[in-house]
Amino acid sequence: ASGLFFAVDPGANASLGGMASTRASGTAAVRYGTMRETVMGLTVVTPDGRIVRTGTRARKSASGLDLTRLYVGSEGLLGIITEVQLRLFGLPEHVVAAVCQFGSLRAAMDTVIATLQLGVPVARIELLNDVQMDACIRYSKLDEFEARPTLFIEFHGSESAVAEQVATVEALALDNGGSGFRYAHQPEDRSRLWKARHSCYHANLAMHPGWSSMGTDACVPISALVECITETEAAIRESGLYAPIVGHVGDGNFHLGIIYDDTDPTARRKAEALAEDVALRAIRLGGTCTGEHGVGLHRIGQIEIEHGEAIELMRDIKRALDPRGIMNPGKMLQM
């Protein structure tokens, strides 16, 4: 559709069905929301072969149970999604990206929190720690930057609104000891920055060729973000592992890319222990073990801790809709 865009900024290998099934998110979720808010309706094939249409084109509805939300994030346990009806957004009149670097991770996070508390409608605000920036500089040739804690920020709106947003956030960054903004006004310059951000996974692997990556997906309330990331950095140091931090911190979501030698059983155990530590810390602080990647096989035990007795209700729903257990067995829920 002319003049519209899909705001849930997909990763390189994403599919719409997969994004709906895992309730995925992305760099623009802080302003535009996740797949939960973006999916308006679905066509689903149920385990008994019925083809069911959920949702309407209306922006809101108080009619019946919200089956769309039931299926979004269900990871194929309750049916197969064959069609997705999406909400699109108008292309912003003006777009500016900026990069700001800091002397400490705490200063960068304080800038994020102050920005959100003031209600500045940033379109994206991404945090990369010094280790992650070092990998990105080497892999994506970002030679104009230093290996320091960094925020990648993007602003959308009218020209005057964007100018006001930029001035507010830059002042907050300077108050926290940040560098002046480096701007990317042209589409090709913005694309270069966001391509580097999306290439973090490959940048991390390039630091240790032949090794494997184990990801984490913790998401916590903004009020717990500083505590969670600070404790996580300490855990990384204690582990001795190479594990850069990058995150969509505008909604409290951050990732570790734990790079380890998969041929070394000790290294794998240490990587698994660190990933488990991050997930359990997020849960303890009122967050979740997975903000956008989903549960799959590896987080089954973690969501049982996170949801407690509610897990049994989830199992009841699974049994009611799929009594023979034919839909994606063994994933998400231990039946």
Q: Which residue stretches match the model-derived regions?
A:
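Small/polar glycine-rich anion-binding or flexible loop at a beta-alpha turn
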Residues: V131-Q132, V249-N253, G294-G301, M335
